[in-house]
């Protein structure tokens, strides 16, 4: 069964007479039986090549609601955007640590880049976002911070210790390692903090590793040896002005107010058992929610153009068109995406004389 909705997908976006690319990655997937046959890093590379062929001028990588997956695909995917270098550090007990490297010097996209995250971007998503942030390779746009899962778990089957048992003894999941950014900081609990913060309807809901019982604490180790990407001409300026614009946005003020209202409705201390009182409460809520119609009715001015894959032309085109139609409808009301594209609009690259190591073929 093909789980198409979990695979990487892309679209071209027209904004202000410019052409941008969006790649959505819901999960870091891999075929463990045959890594080369299917993995998300290879799929993202294919989408980049497709978008570049059409003249993409900037890239948005959407990691929202991506709960993680294969570490190897994170390393390979980071390598699509940087020259060779460290991607993540892994530390177990004692002073031992392992630095995991991208060893391929080729780059498949060296233009402006934005990464979208939210509170549900976790684990492998955080490793990728953190690495691109530490390298100054991409601007992270989204919730105040990501989920904050910076640990590695191994599952131990207890049945192997007692082979003659008539009962299923189950398994133990044990935390064995922690992930660290290449700058030395952990993503545990604190997650990846966005460069440009955009609230959403869940901003005041308790979501994340820090809201679990007894989470491991944040800590820091020595930085890995890496060189920051220095092609942006105005990175700090774009981040500063982006946050200023968000603070002044009337829609953002509404989103914050709505998020606070949603949080206030969680775990109420009391509920009326009187039907008339309950009915009035529901009516009051309905009237109050009318003030948030601007959020519900929000539409951006983006134009989307989907590029067909060779294999898609052979498959059921009606099903593919229906999927893309649903995706486009969601994107047309996506405020965070539109703000990410504004960042791409403003990012300027330095002109360099030396020849970049850019890969055009796979």
Locations of regions flagged by a protein language model:
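Cleft-lining beta-strand/loop regions that shape enzyme active-site pockets
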Residues: 1-161, 329, 333
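A residue-level signal for beta-strand positions that form part of recognition/binding surfaces
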Residues: 19-22, 171-173, 215
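Flexible glycine-/small-residue-rich
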Residues: 24-27, 63, 117, 174-178, ...
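Low-complexity, polar-biased intrinsically disordered regions enriched in Pro/Ser/Thr/Gly
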Residues: 32-37, 157-169, 317-324
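Mature, folded catalytic cores of secreted/periplasmic enzymes
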Residues: 70, 99-100, 139, 166, ...
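Polar, glycine-rich mid-to-C-terminal structural blocks
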Residues: 124, 136, 141-207
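Conserved functional hotspot residues or short segments at active or partner-binding sites
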Residues: 181-359
């Amino acid at each position: 069964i093909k789980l198409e909705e979990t695979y990487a997908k892309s679209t071209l976006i027209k904004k202000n007479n410019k052409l941008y690319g969006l790649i959505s990655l819901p999960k870091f997937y891999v075929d463990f039986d045959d890594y080369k046959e299917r993995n998300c890093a290879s799929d993202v590379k294919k989408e980049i090549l497709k978008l570049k062929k059409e003249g993409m001028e900037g890239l948005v990588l959407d990691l929202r609601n991506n709960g993680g997956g294969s570490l190897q695909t994170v390393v390979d995917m980071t390598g699509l955007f940087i020259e060779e270098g460290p991607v993540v550090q892994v530390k177990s007990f004692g002073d031992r640590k392992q630095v995991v490297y991208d060893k391929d010097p080729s780059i498949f996209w060296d233009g402006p880049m934005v990464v979208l995250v939210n509170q549900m971007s976790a684990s492998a998503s955080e490793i990728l976002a953190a690495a691109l942030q530490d390298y100054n390779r991409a601007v992270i746009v989204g919730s105040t911070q990501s989920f904050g899962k910076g640990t590695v778990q191994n599952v131990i089957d207890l049945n192997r210790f007692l082979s003659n048992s008539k009962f299923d003894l189950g398994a133990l999941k044990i935390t064995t390692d922690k992930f660290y950014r290449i700058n030395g900081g952990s993503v545990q609990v604190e997650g990846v903090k966005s460069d440009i913060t955009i609230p959403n309807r869940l901003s005041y809901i308790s979501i994340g590793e820090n809201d679990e019982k007894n989470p491991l604490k944040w800590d820091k180790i020595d930085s890995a040896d890496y060189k920051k990407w220095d092609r942006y001409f105005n990175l700090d300026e774009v981040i500063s002005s982006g946050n200023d614009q968000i603070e002044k946005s009337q829609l953002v003020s509404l989103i914050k107010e709505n998020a606070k209202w949603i949080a206030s409705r969680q775990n109420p201390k009391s509920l009326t058992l009187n039907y008339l009182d309950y009915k009035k409460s529901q009516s009051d809520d309905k009237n109050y929610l009318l003030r948030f119609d601007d959020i519900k009715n929000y539409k951006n001015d983006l134009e989307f153009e989907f590029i067909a894959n060779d294999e898609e032309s052979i498959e059921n085109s009606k099903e593919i068109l229906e999927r893309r139609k649903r995706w486009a409808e969601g994107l047309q009301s996506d405020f965070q995406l539109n703000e990410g594209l504004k960042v791409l609009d403003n990012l300027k690259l330095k002109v360099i004389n030396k020849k970049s190591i850019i890969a055009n073929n796979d």
